[in-house]
Amino acid sequence: MFFDRDNGIQGLTWALHGSVQPLSVNDRLLLKRAAGSVTEFNEWMRGRGGVDVDVSFMKLIVTGQRQAGVAIIDMRAKIDHCGAPLIGALLYGPPEGEQGNTQIGFDLDDSVPVARQVNSDKSFGDRDYLGRDYFKTNTTPLALGQDEVFSIVATTRSRYCVWYIDLGVFVDGHRQDITIGYKPEGNQGQKPFEVTARADLRNGEKGSFSIYRELYVLDRRHDPAGFVPADPRTYAP
């Protein structure tokens, strides 16, 4: 399992539980040149506890480990807990460019967030972007040593959610459920995924970001673009 940011949808936007401070000299330089070091910046943000905003993208690689084979018959989001959107620091870097392709998705606001087919003729944010229950009509068999890669999107419109993936597999004549999180580099245990909806009003008016304690905005007047501090009480996109 690994994260796969889609900058065409997510841009460089991140949220934090608290402050982005303190910042070292190197941290400040990375913020100042974030658009020129996108991968490094995103890894740095995740390492500081940064949380995806509105949507998370990831790739799940499942490998067959039984001689007789297994079959993936179900996948759903296992919610640990949800609450109000994060209002610590927001790094606001809206997207520019095309979005990538995704296979299945979870709507974390659903009462039962099963894996749903992403409609290829829809864009993120469109009505019916997520369609039918993917595994209602699909079963994925895995032979010993065979890999299957799932491109996954998870969304929320109104909450902060902490969650895992529950994978249902048919093996040795019965069903088993496997709970999957992600493993931070250098960490032996797995952690839950996190995603938060934006807490601001999204109306483009002055003061619409005032709910945040800190705000950093991507300044595209420079090349490469970087983040500069802004007053959340007065900033307007």
Task: Please describe what each predicted stretch is.
Residues 58-62:
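Buried hydrophobic-core signal for structured, non-transmembrane domains
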Residues 42-53, 63-70:
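Short, solvent-exposed beta-strand/turn "edge" segments of beta-rich domains on protein surfaces
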